[in-house]
Amino acid sequence: RNVETFIGSSGRVFPVKGIKPIDVLARIREHLMERGVRIHVEHVFTGFDEAGRPVLENHNGPFTLEADRVIFALGGASWPVTGSTGIWPSLFNAIGIATHPFEASNCGIAIAWPEPVAKAHAGKPLKNIRVSAGDESALGEATITAHGLEGNAIYPVVPALRTALNEAGHATLHIDLKPGNTTEELVRKIGAKEPRNFAEAVHLDRAQLALLKAFTPKERSMSASAFCEDIKDLRLPVTALRPIGEAISTVGGIPTEALSSDFS
């Protein structure tokens, strides 16, 4: 309420420049307090008593919560330094409610870069690319990190990569470095140029060219058609997702099939 916002290129809603996250949080808190909401801080949910009632603990010690209805909004397990330790599923397991283990969701991916790539290009962006994994695909930007890739083009395909890693132990990320051009158009741009001029002809930057050299056979860089095919489908082996503690969000917790129609 009373927070001026705008919609970014990603479709997400952001506060306008000059408004800090703490300001937004304060406005939300004020709105809730005006509606009679009471916020109790420094309380920890520690489990259930023998009657199935929630048990909490504060500086006075443990106590049982008496309520007609309790809504649990316990969060995931990313960024544990903020308090999201992810231990609550075990408390539900103890009363017979099944849960799925937490896994990283919106997160970076691990790729075993050759040392020269990581050293020379960590921190550099891969702009205006399309990435694909399984049936998922996304346009956007990815940043090369010391450990792999991260960014808004990567996060939408993480579920497909996670499935492949869990099922097969490995996964492949497909990158189209020039989604605005077909293979044929790229070949025409190269024309009769020498291989050493291929990258310049199609406007590849140094980071893009470094990835092509690292993950495609050298002989393919000598053929215009093969070089352009690799530009349109650069395949990178994904070894893992980045740790859950680095993830923006997580999946896991109580599955929908464990809930009744009234979410109890």
What are these regions (language model features)?
Residues 69-115:
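Glycine-rich loop(s) and the adjacent beta-strand/alpha-helix scaffold that form part
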Residues 13, 47, 107-108, 246:
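Positions that flank functional sites
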Residues 110-142:
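Acidic, Ser/Thr/Pro-rich intrinsically disordered regulatory segments
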Residues 41-53:
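A conserved short coil-to-beta-strand element within the FAD-binding core of flavoproteins
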Residues 1-38, 43:
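Conserved N-terminal/central alpha/beta ligand/cofactor-binding core
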Residues 1-12, 69-73, 79, 130-264:
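Residue-level recognition of phosphate/Mg2+-coordinating polar/acidic sites
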